[in-house]
UniProtKB/Swiss-Prot annotation:
Origin: domain of life: Bacteria
Protein name: Transcription elongation factor GreA
Gene name of the record: greA
SUPFAM superfamilies assigned to the protein according to its UniProt record, in alphabetical order: FKBP-like, GreA transcript cleavage protein, N-terminal domain
Organism: Lactococcus lactis subsp. cremoris (strain SK11)
Family annotation (Pfam families): GreA_GreB, GreA_GreB_N
PROSITE patterns, per database record: GREAB_1
């Protein structure tokens, strides 16, 4: 059985848009660059040709990866999950015990994780600890060095 890729509807839509861009924009662009580089003649010392071929290989690999993720996407359905329970697709806000600054993250599938925009993978150490917990729960979150104790203050 193939691995499934749990994700939000938004994440699936982003992957579909990326795939369309790769196939309709990026692939034709790199093919044109290869044609131009070939027109320069000798390919043995043609760095533009080599760079374009490398980019083409990357694009084709990414197309294959994205197609697989779309094919085996598993859209999360939180209808049966309690409103105050942390789950994939939900936003969770917590505060370190003894502190006042809140931190908020959306827990998403690995394919759509982007910590810089507040989206953490459901497979990350912090998400694994938080999933299934509820507002008011106090948990120990692993850090690269040690851990911190946090209280879940909001889930939506």
């Amino acid at each position: 059985m193939e691995k499934t890729f749990p994700m939000t509807k938004e994440g699936l839509d982003k992957l579909k848009a990326e795939l369309e861009n790769l196939k309709l924009v990026k692939r034709p662009e790199v093919i044109d660059r290869i044609k131009v580089a070939r027109s320069y003649g000798d390919l043995s010392e043609n760095s533009e040709y080599e760079a374009a071929k490398d980019e083409q290989a990357f694009i084709e690999g990414r197309i294959s990866t994205v197609e697989t993720m779309i094919r085996y996407a598993e859209i999360v359905n939180n209808a049966k999950i309690a409103k105050d329970e942390v789950a994939l697709g939900k936003n969770v806000t917590f505060v370190e015990v003894g502190e006042t600054d809140e931190e908020s993250y959306q827990i998403v599938g690995t394919a759509e994780a982007d910590p810089f925009t507040g989206k953490i993978s459901n497979e990350s150490p912090i998400a694994r600890v938080l999933i299934g917990k509820k507002v008011g729960d106090i948990v120990n979150v692993p850090l690269p060095v040690g851990e911190m104790t946090v209280k879940i203050v909001k889930v939506d």
